[in-house]
Amino acid sequence: MAVPFRKTSKSAKNKRRSHLALVASNLVSCENCGSMIKPHRVCRECGFYKGKEVKSVQD
């Protein structure tokens, strides 16, 4: 089994992990009901997309 020749320093470890940060997802408000949804997706609350009802939502 391969073993590292030298201990990885804290700065090298942190530089390697610099691209692992999580980014917050974009949220927009639904034009029909105002709930927060991901863009370009059907609203789960009211079933509308681009001003048209595309899915019937049961209450």
From Swiss-Prot:
Question: What is an example of a GO molecular function annotated in this UniProt entry?
Answer: structural constituent of ribosome
Any single GO CC term annotated in Swiss-Prot or TrEMBL for this entry? large ribosomal subunit
Can the keyword Acetylation be found in this entry's annotation? no
- Protein origin, superkingdom: Bacteria
Gene3D superfamilies recorded = Single helix bin
Annotated InterPro entries: Ribosomal_bL32, Ribosomal_bL32_bact, Ribosomal_zn-bd
One Gene Ontology BP term is: translation
Residues in coiled coil: none
Q: Which Pfam families match?
A: Ribosomal_L32p (PF01783)
Supply the alphabetized keyword list.
Ribonucleoprotein, Ribosomal protein
HAMAP family, alphabetized: Ribosomal_bL32
Q: Which family does it belong to?
A: Belongs to the bacterial ribosomal protein bL32 family.
Q: What is this protein called?
A: Large ribosomal subunit protein bL32
Organism name:
Mesoplasma florum (strain ATCC 33453 / NBRC 100688 / NCTC 11704 / L1) (Acholeplasma florum)
Q: Name the gene behind this protein.
A: rpmF
